Amino acid sequence: MEAAEKEEISVEDEAVDKTIFKDCGKIAFYRRQKQQLTKTTTYQALLGSVDTEQDSTRFQIISEATKIPLVAEVYGIEKDIFRLKINEETPLKPRLVCSGDTGSLILTNRKGDLKCHVSANPFKIDLLSKNEAVISINSLGQLYFEHLQVPHKQRATKGNGQNTPAATSQENQEDLGLWEEKFGKFVDVKANGPSSVGLDFSLHGFEHLYGIPQHAESHQLKNTRDGDAYRLYNLDVYGYQVHDKMGIYGSVPYLLAHKQGRTVGIFWLNASETLVEINTEPAVEYTLTQMGPAAAKPKVRCRTDVHWMSESGIIDVFLLTGPTPADVFKQYSYITGTQAMPPLFSLGYHQCRWNYEDEQDVKAVDAGFDEHDIPYDVMWLDIEHTEDKKYFTWDKKRFANPKRMQELLRSKKRKLVVISDPHIKVDPDYTVYAQAKEQGFFVKNPEGGDFEGVCWPGLSSYLDFTNPKVREWYSSLFAFPVYQGSTDILFLWNDMNEPSVFRGPELTMHKSAVHYGDWEHRELHNIYGFYQQMATAEGLIQRSKGKERPFVLSRSFFAGSQKYGAVWTGDNKAEWSYLKISIPMLLTLSVSGISFCGADVGGFIGNPEAELLVRWYQAGAYQPFFRGHATMNTKRREPWLFGEEYTQLIREAIRQRYALLPYLYSLFYHTHVSSQPVMRPLWVEYPDDLETFAVEDEYMLGSALLVHPVTDPQTATIDVFLPGSDEVWYDSKTFAYWKGGCTVKIPVTLDTIPVFQRGGSVVPVKTTVGTSTGWMADSPYELRVALSTQGSAVGELYLDDGHSFQYLHQNQFLYRKFLFCSSVLTNRCANEKGHYPSKCIVEQILVLGLKKKPSSVTTHLSDGRAQPAAFTYCAETSALRLEKLSLRIGEDWEVRVG
């Protein structure tokens, strides 16, 4: 390791090589489960042992093969959520928990429309809605639970004679990886032996499944009958392949299934390595000659089987019963939390590179945005800003006066983000290392010493963020007196927190490493980065004494990461295929609870051609997190370096983003309080339209805007599907309109961003764009009113100070509702609890879909004052435009169209 420490660390050390990473066939617990399940293994529920409490029912289940009892607990949770936990009744050691009739048992929710039917032999659970099966558990008999065993060396003294898979030949043990597992030069020694679990779920009538990020794959989950299961195992995969089910940076073990009339979810709460197999049995059509019409209906239903397998832990699963997509999103948020309300600046454009070289480079790039009239909010610094990759430090030569640099950014109402990774350079003279070492805050190796691996600084130890005391200490490092050179405009980026360990097995930490509570790393691998982001966000809140919202971007994530900030899709490439795959990747994150997500604009690896860069900016402008980023060995690609033609196109895309911020910020408030995604697949808004279920090249931004990015080179036309047969859609640029329920061919040039506003919506935008969000606080609004086929429209605006928690603690916010009905546009308060002084006015109103020119337009204030408003009307586009208005955004008023 000493020699490794001295070696040069470069980006190639983490370059993707698929031989570095396991496929399913090389994962021992997967092989064991697949092999054992080919045998007849039946579990029986002992319903004579039922113990019912107020909120749970407990009973034993037992395998005919092992005769070792398991304990099953079924919980009927409010909000139409059911929970099943299965654990050993008397395990040798604790297993990590991430938080009547003898023939059958029936549990019913309070409303009586949902029933949980437990069958005894063979053990099976059916979740029924209105007496029709929605989800069945263990209907395929794939329940699998490896009981903890006494190690071989102790077995003679313990006298353990239980019949287990471990009682096999030495050769078979090695093949099954029971006590140790080999992969390349690495040997994973398992102190507790085999401990994997698995269970199958049958989704009746469903064939469209989504979720279980993160994979560079389609939004709709694919069948895995080829043996290529979806892998959930957080890994640093530099330049990952597209259309691949291998695990990459984050894992959310949460799956949604959707059909006409119902959406359900399965949340498998397990932080160890997990594999998911999916198999859809299509609907079978029967003619009336084969069977009578009464029997035909149940035979037509399709079914999708989902098989979850985890390396360790217990079975702890939540079934979310919907029935609507919105209901499932809310149910999932009850368990894992909603998206944190971001500070407004973080919804602006972020400029990043590995690395901006020094303070002068930062100053020059910052000035370049102003010189070219391109707004941006945040400058980012990667690992090279530190002294020898020691986080919480500054390179004394290149960043000699970091506060002065930040004050320059502050003067322009901009922010700075710096990186802080979980690996800590082994250096006794480095304060952070010395303090953590002294207090025992690093992950341990099996022998009890500090785990050491190689990452950017060379030889490193890794903070054990699973320890609450470590998180508390880490949070304290962000205090201004401790983090020398930091100011209140400095925010954070957690990278490499899968965790990444160069030259480790699969470039990550050994599974035998030991965490707080003596838990092996294998038990909680996927939640490691989650805890770092949690501690970082808490540190930023603490440094402001609880007043200011944090901003933290994390590469690794787990279920619930939405509570602490944003994530992105990792180290993508500057290729068209990565622009295209970014859309389904972000849609999958969005429906899995993580709304604040984005992809590196332009692609992190490689040099994008100008056309690709423009198209990526145009897509990113209409996605939640908007950051340009590039690796160190690429050409510089600031927006003005590709010639004036392309500078103008990128400028326009970014300016469109800034104009749209009132709508986008309102969407984030909506997801913060009600968990509806910001970026939505079409099926979420049109749950009964079969044509939307597999669409992944376009999406909804909120409920009002449909976006279809151009993701192929030299495109002259694109086919856009406009859903809703009884709806109307308006081109946001030309105001041309189409009836919904059809696919339209749209001509595009390089300056075209295909965005359509839904009839029946009101979208608030800013009429002027500043150099950053801070300069736009008092800028006027325009209301874009797109009328439905019935001539009505509705929308909303959320407004607060954009940075503090006063919206939460002191109700300092405005929430306004706009309604156009019977030729009258009204602005009314949508939440009487909120109060916020705003100088902003509505200066312009655009009404699309007005079939004839009005004779007059008048404004009416709450004090009774009325006055005529000047207007223009275009008969060709049926567009009415009002300008030079002065209607206060926080007051009630009406605009009457005569």
Swiss-Prot record:
> Where in this protein does the record put region Disordered?
154-173
The answer on whether this UniProt entry bears the keyword Hydrolase reads: yes
Q: What ranges does the record list as Polar residues composition bias?
A: 157-171
Coiled-coil stretches: none
Is Cell division tagged as a keyword? no
User: Which keywords, in A-to-Z order, does the entry hold?
Assistant: Glycosidase, Hydrolase
Which residues constitute the catalytic centre? Answer: D495, E498, D571
Q: What is its EC number?
A: 3.2.1.20
What is this enzyme's class at the first EC digit? hydrolase
Q: Which GO terms describe its biological process?
A: glucose metabolic process
Gene Ontology MF terms: alpha-1,4-glucosidase activity; carbohydrate binding
User: Cross-referenced Gene3D superfamilies, in alphabetical order?
Assistant: Glycosidases (3.20.20.80), glycosyl hydrolase (family 31) (2.60.40.1760), Golgi alpha-mannosidase II (2.60.40.1180)
**Which Cys-Cys disulfides exist here?**
none
Q: Which Pfam families match?
A: Gal_mutarotas_2, Glyco_hydro_31_2nd, Glyco_hydro_31_3rd
Reactions mediated catalytically: Hydrolysis of terminal, non-reducing (1->4)-linked alpha-D-glucose residues with release of alpha-D-glucose
* Protein family membership: Belongs to the glycosyl hydrolase 31 family.
Function field: Has alpha-glucosidase activity.
Q: Please state what the protein is called.
A: Neutral alpha-glucosidase C
Source species taxonomy: Eukaryota, Metazoa, Chordata, Craniata, Vertebrata
**What gene makes this protein?**
Ganc
